[in-house]
């Protein structure tokens, strides 16, 4: 009985996972997932693994995937008072597929991280509201490092 329930549960979880094919060759731009999907986070994600480290206000994560699909929220914070937020990208390496890494403030994309980012620091002043870092991928073979201070 346990095996039947686990099998049904696994099948239900997998039905929510959608694979997005890379239909535009070497162009890394997203083809199916829109900015609106990223802002609303209205589609799920699969295939993205990570390791995380938190030391006080420092939050860092190393991500990698051979086949990342969907929209994944990497960081979320609600700033009640105007705050300065620093995002450090250690590296971003897209090997194949389509990928976008963005910073979202409330209901708009604040900034898109360049796909060739390497040891880049981005500082945003007077951030107030819901701040998120989101990744979107379509069959993306990608690895990247993100740190939020």
Where are these regions (language model features)?
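Transition segment at domain starts
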Residues: 19-78
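C-terminal motif of bacterial Sec signal peptides marking the signal peptidase cleavage site
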Residues: 13-16
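Noncatalytic modules at the cell exterior or secretory-pathway interfaces
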Residues: 85-88, 123-141
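Exposed low-complexity, polar/acidic, P/S/T/G-rich flexible segments that act as propeptides
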Residues: 139-149
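Short proline/glycine-enriched turn/loop motifs at strand-loop junctions of beta-rich domains
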Residues: 82, 93-98, 137-141
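Positively charged n-region of N-terminal signal peptides that target proteins for export
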Residues: 1-4
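Short, surface-exposed beta-strand/strand-loop-strand elements in extracellular ectodomains
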Residues: 95-111, 146-148
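Short strand-edge motifs at loop-to-beta-strand transitions and within beta-strands
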Residues: 118-122
